[in-house]
Amino acid sequence: MVGREKELSIHFVPGCCQLVEEEVNIPSRRVLITGATGLLGRAVYKEFQQSNWHAVGCGFRRARPKFEQVNLLDSEAVHHLIHDFQPHVIVHCAAERRPDVVESQPDAASQLNVGASGNLAKEAAAIGAFLIYISSDYVFDGTNPPYTEEDIPSPLNLYGKTKLDGEKAVLENNLGAAVLRIPVLYGEVEKLEESAVTVMFDKVQFSNKSANMDHWQQRFPTHVKDVASVCRQLAEKRMLDPSIKGTFHWSGNEQMTKYEMACAIADAFNLPSSHLRPITDSPVIGAQRPKNAQLDCSKLETLGIGQRTPFRIGIKESLWPFLIDKRWRQTVFH
């Protein structure tokens, strides 16, 4: 521990409620998480905080108490945040991750996914912080899986291109940084639309109406808490070994189409799935997607880094508050 700070807490005793100022320990290892109010960022923040790190999270559009509100496009604000906090590690989760939004707003997406990432890498290098840049399996075209870190990227859509350009901007500005490519994510969402996996739950539950589900693109749904654990393990290993840098892959190992995920979700909650209709044709609407961008994760596994939650277990943990008869619980427990 390197210090102590004072924090207000509420103490309840029979017939009395008191606001008490207490001293709390400050862990010596410091980590800054961008996009900490998003699905992955929340999990990364929680993982580090529960592992004896002094974690500071920042967000912008969804900023909330205990998190810094920072516009990553404001280079001066980013400079002050990093130089004031002096993190040992920065996990850069903030991004425009929706392919169709990137296609419709290319300039704004590029500013965040590329420009802000390069600037963050430069600021991290200036103080000697280890930067982990979260990238995507969409940097590959999906024609020759599984992909290792040495395979040449060839993105099919603008989202994949901005993430690849972000990788280049990070590694050009910070030779000691790490790039972590990951696939489609799910986890404890605040709303179903927060994940391309959980958003299917309403279609699964409303079995009185048939629903078309993609049965063409092969996905590897990955729990955000597993990615968060990998980020922490990578950071802790880097603090002991400066050779830990460069590009890494992490992914769940259960291959499923959206149709198969939806059926697995139905099975996990003992719901019918006969109303779900598999569509085997390549999607013609929206940004082009890779058919199978499976990531080879053996590089991290060789380092002894990794964690995988079985999809059935993870999806049940994530979605139970959104069951039609339990939605009132979201405001209380979730």
Curated annotation (Swiss-Prot):
InterPro entries: dTDP_dehydrorham_reduct (IPR005913), NAD(P)-bd_dom_sf (IPR036291), RmlD-like-bd (IPR029903)
A biological-process GO annotation: one-carbon metabolic process
Stretches for region Required for interaction with MAT2A: 319-334
Pfam families assigned: RmlD_sub_bind
Residues with the Phosphothreonine modification: T309
Keyword NADP attributed: yes
GO CC entries: methionine adenosyltransferase complex; nucleus
Keywords, in A-Z order: NADP, One-carbon metabolism, Phosphoprotein
List of residues binding NADP(+): T37, G38, L39, L40, F60, R61, R62, N71, L72, C93, R97, Y159, L185
CDD domains according to UniProt: dTDP_HR_like_SDR_e
Residue runs in coiled coils: none
Source taxon at top rank: Eukaryota
Family: Belongs to the dTDP-4-dehydrorhamnose reductase family. MAT2B subfamily.
Function: Regulatory subunit of S-adenosylmethionine synthetase 2, an enzyme that catalyzes the formation of S-adenosylmethionine from methionine and ATP. Regulates MAT2A catalytic activity by changing its kinetic properties, increasing its affinity for L-methionine. Can bind NADP (in vitro).
Subunit note: Heterotrimer; composed of a catalytic MAT2A homodimer that binds one regulatory MAT2B chain. Heterohexamer; composed of a central, catalytic MAT2A homotetramer flanked on either side by a regulatory MAT2B chain. NADP binding increases the affinity for MAT2A.
Entry protein name: Methionine adenosyltransferase 2 subunit beta
Naturally occurring in which organism (per UniProt): Rattus norvegicus
Gene that produces this protein: Mat2b
